[in-house]
Amino acid sequence: MKAAFDIEKHQLFISASVGISVFPSDALNAEQLLRNADSALFKAKNAGREGYALYTEELTVHALNRIEVASDLRRALEQHELRVYYQPVHDLNTSRLIGVEALVRWQHPLRGLVPPGEFIPIAERTGLIAEIDAWVLEQACWQMCQWQSAGVDLSFVAVNISSRLFARPELYTLVSTVLADTGLDPALLELEVTESAVMDDSQGALEQMHRLRALGLRLAIDDFGTGFSSLLRLKRLPVQKLKIDQGFVAGLPGDNDDVAIVRAVIALSHSMGLQVHAEGIEQIEQAQFLLNLNCNLGQGYWFGRPMPASELDWQRAPAISR
């Protein structure tokens, strides 16, 4: 199924996630069978998509938990329980902190800080992710304005845009309204969209990106290397940056496959005039290796974890030697 389909001069890709529930061992009626298969499908998608999962009784417990979390998450939006944390992004050449990525966190009144891996997939499944994205965008822009007023020298604040929100025509209006309301210079805002979101509707994505780019902001492809984008499509996108997925960075510098992929992505990016941003840097050896490959920017626990705006250390510049 990974093979491309050529339809009207466009290359299209399809994939499948499958949830399996068996009659009569898993259920005694069609309604329950479908419900259990849906739980298994959620597990398959959570495991990275493009695979299958079998139903187990444990999934029913997970399904009930998802319903509870989804209900709590709706309340969290209304009760202002969400928080925006910021993870520093460093210039690998100078080690200087030059930007931040805005990341949502949930401060639950009873459970404390809920891990994003626990509620983001549910937010995506229920459609709440678009509303969360919009809120994070507004908060990040206001915060960037405050930093600018305080004299903090930052080149950009990056905000993730989910595939659900990216596919909506009203995204342009949302972004332009937030920029107008906050007064933030559009050049200081970077929107990140995943490679898979762009490939889901390449023509629609291209039009959406050109509209957003016309506002004067920056665009980045997140998790690059995890999808099936063609170079022909990539060169048409009005993006300024490719972000290397942390899954490829984790194996550096010892994994030969990761080394080959990262080296190729960096070379490709530079040949197209794009910046390269590596995520998931947890060791100095990874930072040094990426610097030697001429990667531009780095982000990860070695530089700093996501944290509240008040806790960012603007002077931190860990030395990286070639």
What are these regions (language model features)?
Residues L34, Y172-V175, S202-A205, M209, ...:
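Heptad-repeat coiled-coil signal-transmission/dimerization helices
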Residues K2, M144-Q148, L179-A180, L206-A214, ...:
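Surface-exposed amphipathic alpha-helices with a cationic face
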Residues H10, R49, L82, L128, ...:
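Short glycine/serine/threonine/alanine-rich loop segments
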